[in-house]
Structure formats: structure tokens, C-alpha cells
Amino acid sequence: IGLSLVGSEMCIRDRLRNDQLNNKNKIKIGFIGGGPNSFIGYTHRLAARFDNRFNFVAGVFSKDKKKSKEFGKSLGLDTDRCYNDYKIMAKKESARSDGVQAVGIMTPSGDHYKIAREFIKSNVHIICDKPLTSKVEDAVALEKLVHKNKIVFALTHNYSGYPMLREAKKLVEKNKIGKIKLINVEYPQGYTVAVKKKDEKSTLKWRLDKNMCGPSMILAEIGTHAYHLMRYVTGLEVNEVSAEVNSLSDEISVDDNAFMTVRMNNKARGSIWVSSAATGGENGLKIRVYGTKGAVEWLQDDPNILKFTELNSSTQIITRASDAVSDLSIQSSRVAAGHPEGFFEAFANIYTEFADSIQANLKKNKKDLIHPTVNDGVMGIKFIFAAKKSSNLNSKWIKI
């Protein structure tokens, strides 16, 4: 499909213009978690800086006050705004005229609800790692709080920020592939193959400690991503799931592999395979959607292209930022076609859209939300429990 620089160059100019416009009106943000050696903490901070929409002013980086202040200072923060407890941060920041307007939460999922609840009391907007919580009742309660207080809540299902994944969604919406019949999502990783029992006390403890990872490590870590991707691209909902969730490792006790078959609300069928026990697997996230008129395929290993096949026709390769893609895909890009974009840019799209939603909220304007929301989080935690229940009942079909 033809390639053009026009769309992407316009997008870059628009972003530069927005960068200048928003320089005087940045949203003050703080972070809970993501201390030293945290990849996800680094990712959140980088994503928040990408489009110059946030001013990073405060945070909790350790339960140890000295360590939190030292790390905050290394990030350029005023040490008076580096806390060791989220309740103290919420109280002190709410008392300031220049206090945080938003917080990013990147702690174990069991802590998400109580942290978010504390800041919602002060009308602080939330961007949170997935899964939303570790309990269904906490997720439902959090959703009610968000709506009651009219808070903007974004969930970092960051893969939905990839431009060409968004293009796949647009092709589905335009009925280019017809009625959806089959959906396949897979996400193989391989790190638990080499994990040993002693690693449960290492930096992997969030994933390997049952008390921290919730009812199922693999479903919480990447199963929710696969499930969200299926819903996001197709616009469909999963009605029922039949699952086999287990641990293939002899060294650890948490789940590290899941095979799932799903029934969609349009009677389509789908399959999801997620694993951290796939030897050699890195982050091979892949989605394929098959319909009556065509099919789309996207792979994170090659994120700047989308394969689109029309019925009785050859497969087309659509490239990011080309003249063939939708406005949404163009708006989600930063550099001209031919230059690669990847994980960090996709994550940054969620942050930028979070900022857009906050600005609309402050002006009391209604805005169609592009980023994942608290509702997506509720659906994700319900999916975890349904799949785990199915597995415990010998793969019985369970409604979500």
C-alpha cells in the first residue's frame, strides 16, 4: 500500500504545537511505586514526559523515608514532596495550592484499590497499572467511586496505544473484515523456565508470591492484556470462557501457563494462550481476527505494520503513518513513516490521552475516551476469576 510522509509530518507538527500550547498548563502528577530498579516505574515516568503534558512533582518510592527521598532527589524532585506512605502524600498534597492533580499507581494489584480510594477523596485523577485490583469486589467498588466523584481513570493496557493495532480496530469498525467469526490472541514469554525457588524473594517476588500476584500470576500479568486486546480490536465482549490454567514449572507454585477458549457475544469463537513457560519466548504478543470479508493480523515483534487480507485477495502490508491509515492511527504516531516506533511510544499515547481526558474534565467538557478505563479494569478482573474458576472445574464453561 502506498507510502506518504504527509500524514505523519502533519502529526509531528500538531504534537509540537500542542507541546508549546501545553507548556504553561501542565498537569501536576505524582507516582506511587516504581522505585529504583523498577522497569515499569521508568516506563511510566518516561511516558508521562513524552508529549510534555505533565509536571512530575511528588511521589512515594519506598516505605523507607530516606530511600524514598534519595530516589526522588535523583529524579529532580523536592525532597519535601518525596513520601514513604501514600496516605501521608494524599493528605499533604491535598493541603497544597500546587498539589498533585493526578497520580500514577504502580504497586502490587492488591494495593491499588486502597491507594486510588485515598486520592479520589481529594478529587485526584488516577492512572493505574493492570490488573485493576486483586478482588472483584474491590474493582466494582472502585468503579463506583470513580463515577460518583467524576474522576478520570486510565488503566495502562498500553498495547492498545500502538498505532497499527488501532488501525486494526478501525478496519473492524469500517466493516472491512465483515462479521467476525474467529479471534486468536497469544502472548508467549519464557522467563519462568529458568526461575528457581529462591527467586521468589528476588525482584520477581511480585509475580512469584501468591500473596502479591492474586489468584493467578499468568492471568494477572499478561492474560488481562490478551483479553483486553481481544475486546479492544473487535469491539466484542466475551460471554463465556473455558480454561486450563496451571504451573508448568517444577520450581514455582504460581500459574505460568493458560489455554483459554472463549465464546463472544456475536457467537464468534476465540482462543487465548498466555505463558511465561514458553522456552525462548520474549514478548510475542499477537492477535489475528478473521471475518466473512477479510482478516487482520498484528504482531508486537513488528509493530509498525498490519497485515490485512480481503476475501479472495492477496495479503496487504499496511505501514504505520502511511497515506492508507486512519486519522486515529496518524494521531497516535510521532515520527514519519519508515522510522520505527514501539513500546514506549504506545505507553505514552495512554498518558497523553489521559491528559486530554483530564483537561476536558476540568473544563466540564464531554470527551470520547480512547484510553482504557476503570470499566476495562473491572472486566479484566472478572475475566481472571472466571478463567480460574473454569480451570478449577476441569475447564467447565463459565460466564463472565
Where is each model-derived feature located?
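Single conserved hydrophobic/aromatic residue that forms the stacking wall/gate
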Residues: 1-12
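Glycine-rich, aromatic-lined ligand/substrate-binding cores of catalytic
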Residues: 220-295, 300-304
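C-terminal glycine/acidic-rich active-site capping loop/insertion
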Residues: 16-20, 158, 259, 264, ...
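Beta-loop-alpha module in the N-terminal Rossmann-like domain of NAD(P)-dependent dehydrogenases
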Residues: 81-145
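N-terminal Rossmann-like dinucleotide-binding module
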Residues: 13-77, 355
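Predominantly a Rossmann-like dinucleotide-binding segment in NAD(P)-dependent oxidoreductases
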Residues: 152, 159-252, 306, 394
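C-terminal helix-rich "cap/oligomerization" subdomain common to oxidoreductases
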Residues: 13-25, 104, 339, 353-400
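Hydrophobic residues in well-ordered beta-strands that form the structural core
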Residues: 128, 134, 153-155, 184, ...
